[in-house]
Amino acid sequence: MSNVLARKPDWLKLRLSAHGEFAATRQLLEQRNLNTVCRSAMCPNLQECWSRGTATFLLLGNICTRTCRFCAVGTASIPPMPDSLEPENIAEAVEIMNLNHVVLTSVNRDDLADGGARHWQKTMQAVRQRNPKVTLECLIPDFQAQTEALDIVLAEAPEVLNHNIETVPSIYHIVRPEANYSSSLNIIRRAKEHFNLTTKSGLMVGMGETFDEVVQSLHDLVQHGCDMVTIGQYLQPSASHIPVNRYVTPEEFDRYKTVAESLGLRNVRSGPFVRSSYLAETLSPDH
């Protein structure tokens, strides 16, 4: 992989301005000691989403047991135990924010016997009990390919089950050394074949993959029962992370979208700043 590129192209320059509900969203999250992937993963869309009064809740703390080389989330072999109040605090925040579509995600917790699956279950149940009309999108980890743990979450029947394959097979060992491409695809397949869930996945580009490799991964997703996909530009969080190989042009993102739709993926979002949960409500089953 090449060294990090010195200058971002114009299409990757954001005008940052906090307005609207930004301050209220930040205060609400801080008061309830809630983590968001928006902040922990250094998402470029944080100000836009928080200003619209939306956020993606990060379960099981903000310390991950894995060291994926693209991710800004902090790591440790044994993070603090999960906050038992988190499910109710998230449910309360959803109610106060008056959300219609809620995105939940989590760090990997390989230190826990069930990978945090029961905590996921409690959170989903708490959110629905307090907000019966809300739709849930769950962006889940792989639970170390433990079917029993995975099924605890799938059995709660979220309206959208999201699991990102993240990248193509040829660089998986570099990007996600503690994960497995086939295992991630099989999560999508199990959610579809055994639970008939609406499924979603995501890819980052600009890490050394080729156009044809991305197209093949889109084929793989379709063959494993994926309904929706997001494709976005990888941005290096720090000097210790994988360097950006190239900046993918908006035109190439449009090509990915065209290919994905031609393969039968019914909801596709493809662009430089696209992230898994960005404008997730517009990719929900009702849209």
UniProtKB/Swiss-Prot annotation:
Stretches assigned to the Radical SAM core domain: 50-266
**E.C. designation(s):** 2.8.1.8
* Record-listed [4Fe-4S] cluster 1 binding positions: C38, C43, C49, S277
InterPro entries, alphabetized: Aldolase_TIM, Elp3/MiaA/NifB-like_rSAM, Lipoyl_synth, rSAM
Its localization reads:
Cytoplasm
- Give the chief site where it resides: cytoplasm
Keywords (A to Z) from UniProt: 4Fe-4S, Cytoplasm, Iron, Iron-sulfur, Metal-binding, S-adenosyl-L-methionine, Transferase
The signal peptide, as residue positions, is: none
As for family, the record states:
Belongs to the radical SAM superfamily. Lipoyl synthase family.
This chain's protein is named Lipoyl synthase
**What taxonomic classification does the UniProt entry list for its organism?**
Bacteria, Pseudomonadati, Chlorobiota, Chlorobiia, Chlorobiales
